[in-house]
Every structure is written in C-alpha cells, then in structure tokens.
C-alpha cells in the first residue's frame, strides 16, 4: 500500500478551458481525486468539451463550471476562477494536463513547509515521459530570449554565463525541491496570501507570458518559487492552440513585448530595446511563414492524393 495516505488537499483547482475536447474530462477526473474543489472556467468553447464534462460528472458538488460567454484570454479566465475559489491554496492547471498520483499532495507539502514560498510547480512531462522545457526555468530576459531564439545557447558550454539557456530541462533533474526563477502557467500552485500581496493575473496578456509576469511580481514581493521534481504531471502541450497557430503566434509575440517593456525597459538602452522589438517581430514573421508553407504543402499533397 502507498505510504502516502490518500486525502483531498485544501486546494481549489482552476482550469481555464477553450476547446480542450475530451482531455478536459480526463483532467477533471484526475483533479477530483486529489483536490477539495475544481473550478472550470469555460472561455466560450465551441466544441463538446463542456457537454462531455457535465455528462461525465452529473451532480458532482465539488465541480463548479463557470461559463464566461466570451474568450477574454487565459489570464482573465484565471482571475475569474480565482474569484470563485474557496480554498487556501489555488492550483492553476491547464485542461491538457493530467495530475499523477500524489503529485498535488507533494506540491502542497512543499508549499506548507516554508511560509516564504508563494508558488510551487511540478515536474511537467510529455506523454512519452520526457521533461518539458517550461516547468523549471530562469526568467527569459531580453538577452536570454535573443540567445534562445537564434540558437546561441549552443555556445553555452564555452561561455555559460553569456549564452545561458533559460530552459532548465536539459540540466539533471534535482533530487529535492529547488528554488527557481519561474515555472509554467500550465501548473502553478499558489498561496492565497501571496496572491493578495503580488496581485492577480495581468489581464493585458491574452495568451502567453502572463505566467512569467506573475513570477516576476512574486519575486519582487520576495516570495519564493519552488520546483518539485517528484510531482509529475503529464502535459499534452498545445492541445487547445494547435488548430489556431497564427492566432497563438500573434499573442505569444505580443505578450513577449509587453513582458519586456514592463520589466526591462529601464534596464536596457532604448536602442537595444528597439532591436529586441524588431527581432521579436522578425521571429513572428518567420513563424507565420513556416506555418503558411506547411499549410500550403498539406493542401497540395491532399489534392494530389
């Protein structure tokens, strides 16, 4: 028998859904086994995800489904769920994530072990068991993002301080919880007191970089952010955004610029910030071009089969 006794954690799990399909039901099923309260905020989904969810859990009093009626973005959805949460800890969880057995309990244990810890993340893995890049990372400063975007992190072994890769999944997995600069918004366990101190999610971000913004603000208020290596969560990354690559790319790059201007404008010369802005939009243009070429190739291949 597992030495970790099964119990529901004093956690409200907030899941922001937009067309997550059958994965939403799987996500909620795993969440109900570990947390006191599940809040699903539906941002105007057009698929059957909510219908499947209500059919699977009729009369479940620990499940609260909130239909916003519009898609106001991930951060706004998180704040809607936060307003409805009743537990002392809140886990923001993507609908394409599956909590593994005892993962939430281990994250809560770390959060409760130090009153200075405001945010905890788990071990985000792909379906094949490999670690994803965003679960533990350094803050992507404009320079670090430039290094990452243009592949200069390959020079890290020669000049580690200059060409540092902010994704830490290439480093050995730690044997114990460690403090990090940032974790992924797909899996964030947060102390309510820390939220009251740092403030809610910034709703000016529609999609992407709002998690980094929150990590920065938590650190500015001296709250620790901790990565828990023995709390695995499977993340089917991109499930909700795969069908809208241009839309997602636009908001991702727009979010990057807001993040840089908000936190680094005073630290970098205006000329360098201008170059960073140019490089971000150049990267966006290349991303759009790649997607367009792929779509044209698929259409051409389909017509000739």
PLM regions and their residue ranges:
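Short, well-formed alpha-helical segments that are part of the catalytic scaffolds
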Residues: 15, 19-34
